[in-house]
A protein has these predicted regions:
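Short loop/turn segments at secondary-structure transitions that flank enzyme active sites
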Residues: 58, 285-287, 358
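Extracellular or exported targeting regions of proteins
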Residues: 86, 434-436
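Glycoside hydrolase catalytic-domain groove-lining segments
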Residues: 215-327, 346, 350
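Secretory targeting and sorting signals
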Residues: 1-27
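Active-site mouth of glycoside hydrolases
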Residues: 33-49, 53-252, 257-265
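A short, compositionally biased
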Residues: 30-36, 423-426
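Short, hinge-like loop/turn segments at secondary-structure boundaries
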Residues: 140-143, 270-273, 338-340, 370-372
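Aromatic-rich peripheral "rim/lid" segments of glycoside hydrolase catalytic domains that contact
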Residues: 158-161, 280, 330-433, 443-470
Length: 470
């Protein structure tokens, strides 16, 4: 994920005015989550997704996706996660116009098979960074990159600023407006959807990662973002959703705003005319991306939540945050950041994918030994992966380690599933109401999915608390 030092310089005074406009709602408390539907499965159960992005941005051609291994999914599941956002690249899938790589599709399928083995649901993300390989990155193929001869200057120390290079911005305009490129992008999605429609691990399709566009003369960044979202991204998403539906009418389509929403700006996206749409913003703070510590007094999380919830409330669609997580996770205030960020995400979203599950430093979730890097262990907590009924209350107290779910059981097929990460003390499960489980306790050091069944129509309370340390 890039550093985003460029964004605040371009937004300037207009952003300050917009943040001031949303401050009263933030001051009144967290945004009201009512009106945002939850993600559901084909049995009607309410879903919660917790997981990570998985990627290989380095290898191409015969080596494409080789950095993603079965270990990624085994280790994620061992910590209780049930979701992965898989980055795939159009330039690898269709390196020459009209010639799709069967080998690349097989590599994707192998990864999906691993995910299925470990019961992890996958969002296939058509990823781009700074448009694609024409500018030294990944995403849209070079044959689909048109710049009209405009200049491009690399910025290796701040690559996100390359989005504001004239050639990159013009390439986005052509992608959105040129009829042949529109058709090519739609064909690419039909190929993916047709191949993976019936794969059990596939949850949905993220139609494009962090889309950007071209600023007009005299236009500030917030105004440009809203215009691009309204008049270019909305039609594109409707075209691509139609393309997916020509092959797959069951899985979800995920749509992203521009990355500018990270500054607490509401999206300008219009209606996506599809029955299974998920709003999938990213959750990054410019200052933290540039290396700063979390500033609790700035009110950024509150402003972001107030802004990002407006669109899904209006459109009545679920929210899944597709990327989030700071680069420097061990700074003094980062423990508080994780607590407050996770609490915020739980208020309005159906889940999230942290950035990124890899083994090392930087953004990696875990180190070379597979141990969580500082503060990232907070992402592994109890949650209700699936609820067979209407959720009344869903809370987790990180201080006591106690999780509580209250729901009104429905007569649908399937059980309520509580995902528990490994704990040094294990877990105890208590039920209140006409309900039963075969797993009243979970041993120390083991992740577990606890299944609860209840009498249809009854109110059930599930309380999970730490067990007795060994």
């Amino acid at each position: 994920m890039p550093t985003r030092r460029t964004i605040p310089l371009l937004i300037g005074t207009c952003l300050l005015l917009l943040l001031a406009a949303v401050a009263p709602a933030s001051a009144a408390g967290p945004s009201d989550p009512a009106g945002i539907p939850r993600l559901t499965d084909d049995r009607g159960r309410t879903l919660t997704l917790r997981g990570w992005n998985v990627e290989d941005k380095t290898n191409r051609g015969d080596r494409a996706l080789s950095a993603i291994t079965e270990k990624h999914f085994r280790d994620m599941r061992a910590q209780g996660f049930n979701f992965a956002r898989l980055l795939v690249f159009w330039d690898d899938l269709e390196p020459r116009r009209g010639q799709y790589s069967a080998a690349y599709l097989c590599k994707i399928e192998r990864i999906l098979d691993w995910a299925e083995t470990y019961d992890i649901q996958v969002l296939i993300d058509s990823h781009q960074d700074v448009f694609g390989p024409a500018f030294g990155h990944r995403g849209i193929p070079e044959w689909a990159t048109r710049t009209d001869g405009l200049p491009f200057t690399p910025h290796p120390d701040d690559w996100f600023s390359e989005y504001f290079e004239p050639a990159v911005q013009r390439a986005f305009t052509h992608l959105y407006e040129d009829e042949d490129l529109r058709r090519a992008q739609a064909r690419m999605w039909r190929v993916i959807a047709d191949r993976f429609e019936h794969h059990p691990a596939v949850l949905g399709y993220d139609l494009i990662n962090e889309p950007m566009g071209e600023l007009r003369a005299g236009e500030d960044l917030p105004a440009a973002a809203r215009r691009i979202e309204r008049y270019q991204l909305t039609p594109m998403y409707n075209r691509l959703a139609d393309a997916v539906r020509s092959a797959d009418d069951g899985n979800w389509v995920f749509v992203e705003p521009t990355p500018i929403v990270g500054e607490g700006l509401p999206t300008g996206l219009g209606r996506i005319k599809d029955p299974k749409v998920v709003y999938a913003p990213h959750f990054y703070n410019t200052a933290m991306e540039a290396g700063a510590d979390y500033d609790p007094s700035a009110g950024w999380i509150e402003s972001y939540e107030a802004a990002v919830t407006a669109y899904p409330k209006e459109q009545r669609i679920p929210v899944v945050v597709g990327e989030w997580g700071p680069l420097n996770n061990s700074l003094p205030n980062m423990g508080r950041f994780y607590r407050e960020a996770l609490a915020s995400l739980n208020r309005y979203s159906s889940g999230w994918a942290g950035y990124v599950w890899c083994y090392g430093g930087g953004y990696c979730a875990v180190d070379e030994r597979g141990l969580f890097r500082t503060n990232k262990e907070q992402t592994a907590a109890p949650y209700a992966a699936a609820v067979a009924g209407r959720v009344v209350a869903d809370t987790y107290d990180p201080g006591s380690g106690t999780y509580r779910l209250v729901y009104r059981a429905h007569g649908w097929r399937g059980a309520t599933e509580i995902s528990l990460p490994p704990s040094a003390s294990g877990w105890r499960i208590a039920l209140d109401g006409p309900a039963w489980t075969d797993t009243p306790t979970v041993p120390a050091g083991r992740a577990c999915t606890v299944r609860v069944r209840g009498l249809p129509g009854a109110q059930i309370t599930v309380t999970v608390s730490p067990g007795t340390p060994r």
